[in-house]
Amino acid sequence: MREIINIHIGQAGIQAGEQVWSLMCAEHGINQDGTRNSTSANGNSDCSVLFSEGSRGKYVPRNLMVDLEPSVVDSVRNSSYKELYHPAQMITGREDAANNFARGHYTVGKDMLDVTVDRLRKIADNCTSLQGFQIFHSVGGGTGSGFASLLVERLSVEFPKKCKLSYTVYPSPQLATSVVEPYNSVLSTHSLLEHNDISVVLDNQAIYDICKQRLKIERANYRNLNHVISQTVSAITCSLRFSGSLNVDMNEYQTNLVPYPRIHFMLSSLAPMISRQENYYHENNVAELTSSVFEADNMMAKCNPRDGKYIASCLMYRGDVVNKEVTDAVKNVKSKANIQFVDWSPCAFKIGVNSQKPTVLPDSEFAQVERSCAMISNNTAISQVFERMNDKFDLLYAKRAYVHHFVSEGMEEGEFAEAREDLAALEKDYTELASNSVNEEDSMLDEGETLN
């Protein structure tokens, strides 16, 4: 048993979590009230990774939902899954973070930190061999940026040897919900750089485009977006939850994908992403799926991987897949001139193969398919996300616009400059890692640059 605790922070994290847990229940044969559905339970599944079993045979998610104000959590308490969640594992405050990192990190959020950590300790004490934590949040809002950063910092102290993998929603190039999103994002990323182990970067614009172009949804809403996120999370964690011929655990993700602690921001992709109506026209063989996950249109963040180089990637196949087909498909990808790899990384691929077919919910736009492929990749093109974010930060900070809102919550103004300099160093790190010269790479490390 290798348990994972899921933490959902703020509106984005909690709403994504609702969809994730609906799908996890369907995959593991668990009803909305937590009872086991013997007819749909899969014999290869280890639901104890994500669920604890109570004394009456009821299964409870190993999760925690936290928000600084109650409305989003209250909607979960009144949802059709209200009996699934343990009431003590839904924590709310009385006032929100008002889209302000400093409120989530220094004032309102700080007051909720101890009760949150105490509850996490109790959940961890109920685990026999805790693998680590999955954290769902957005860095654009105040709670998802400020409180999530504060909690991840504390987890590094309380659980120093446990892997922390976050699904982090970044502001979209064209979609902004708050004028201070660039501040929140830079300040939060500055903290994640030091304290998080793996950050899977998502952005709403990329997922909107997937909904429109791939799933043929003309006007996608957050529920549609969260369906895409939940399918991606399911595919990434499949080998953690089901037995297979080639399985990958959380620590292997970290070992294989993260060459230096700071370089832990990942792209993710999934194939096939097709609507129910189009399912009849797609072959979806292993070679096609493998090629598709390297396409920019299938990436969950707005950047072009062909502008960068792959440092490493994990490919997770599930369903009707033969190992030899996977080997042939990977060889084919390696031979493509438009997919580049850094020459200093000895092994670019980690493979997971699992026989469990993908599951789709009845209200999902996704077609039911026989096989799928998901990829988490470390590609230097992810720096495009940070470049856009930094440019927007600079426009605001040049005028010191809205800075007083943060300073009035106990934050030092110098933290803005410190965080921005750290992000500039991160951009430089990715530029240097894309260098083809091993000698240049060696010299970069000798000079004591920021990759440590």
Curated annotation (Swiss-Prot):
GO biological process terms held by the UniProt record: microtubule-based process
Active site: 252
InterPro entries, sorted: Alpha_tubulin, Beta-tubulin_BS, Tub_FtsZ_C, Tubulin, Tubulin/FtsZ-like_C, Tubulin/FtsZ_2-layer-sand-dom, Tubulin/FtsZ_GTPase_sf, Tubulin_C
Pfam families, A to Z: Tubulin, Tubulin_C
Keywords: Cytoplasm, Cytoskeleton, GTP-binding, Hydrolase, Magnesium, Metal-binding, Microtubule, Nucleotide-binding
Signal peptide: none
Reaction(s) catalysed (UniProt annotation): GTP + H2O = GDP + phosphate + H(+)
List of residues binding Mg(2+): 69
Listed SUPFAM superfamilies: Tubulin C-terminal domain-like, Tubulin nucleotide-binding domain-like
Residues given in the record as GTP binding sites: 11, 69, 138, 142-143, 177, 204, 226
Domain of life: Eukaryota
Keyword rRNA-binding recorded: no
GO CC annotations on file: cytoplasm; microtubule; spindle
Requisite cofactors: Mg(2+)
A GO MF label: structural constituent of cytoskeleton
Localization in the cell: Cytoplasm, Cytoskeleton, Spindle
Top EC category: hydrolase
Function: Tubulin is the major constituent of microtubules, a cylinder consisting of laterally associated linear protofilaments composed of alpha- and beta-tubulin heterodimers. Microtubules grow by the addition of GTP-tubulin dimers to the microtubule end, where a stabilizing cap forms. Below the cap, tubulin dimers are in GDP-bound state, owing to GTPase activity of alpha-tubulin.
Quaternary context: Dimer of alpha and beta chains. A typical microtubule is a hollow water-filled tube with an outer diameter of 25 nm and an inner diameter of 15 nM. Alpha-beta heterodimers associate head-to-tail to form protofilaments running lengthwise along the microtubule wall with the beta-tubulin subunit facing the microtubule plus end conferring a structural polarity. Microtubules usually have 13 protofilaments but different protofilament numbers can be found in some organisms and specialized cells.
Protein name per Swiss-Prot or TrEMBL: Tubulin alpha-6 chain
Organism: Naegleria pringsheimi
